């Protein structure tokens, strides 16, 4: 394998994981903070808020997992080799 392609694949994998984690990380922090705030204002709605929060956190986390899958493909099943 060309060393330039190998180095570019490693850098691209690092960027894929890093950039894929920034957005969902900020979103999860914001969503969790707002959920805690909502539960503090309306304790009787805790069940609905928590259910919605967990579902939305799962969707946000899937974006990070997609970035990880792309990084693993670039590292181990390199399509550019």
Curated annotation (Swiss-Prot):
Q: Write the record's keywords in alphabetical order, separated by commas.
A: ATP synthesis, CF(0), Hydrogen ion transport, Ion transport, Lipid-binding, Membrane, Thylakoid, Transmembrane, Transmembrane helix, Transport
Q: Which residues cross the membrane?
A: 5-25, 57-77
Principal subcellular localization: membrane
Q: Where in the cell is it found?
A: Cellular thylakoid membrane
In what way does this protein cross or attach to the membrane?
Answer: Multi-pass membrane protein
Q: Does the keyword Hydrolase apply?
A: no
Superkingdom of source: Bacteria
Would the keyword Repeat be found if you checked this record's keyword annotation?
no
To which protein family does this belong? Belongs to the ATPase C chain family.
Name assigned to this protein: ATP synthase subunit c
Q: Which organism is it from?
A: Microcystis aeruginosa (strain NIES-843 / IAM M-2473)
């Amino acid at each position: 394998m060309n060393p330039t392609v190998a180095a570019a694949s490693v850098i691209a994998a690092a960027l894929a994981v890093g950039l894929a984690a920034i957005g969902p990380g900020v979103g999860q922090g914001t969503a969790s903070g707002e959920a805690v705030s909502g539960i503090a204002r309306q304790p009787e709605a805790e069940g609905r808020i928590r259910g919605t929060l967990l579902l939305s956190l799962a969707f946000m986390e899937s974006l990070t997992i997609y970035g990880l899958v792309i990084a693993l493909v670039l590292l181990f099943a390199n399509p550019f080799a």
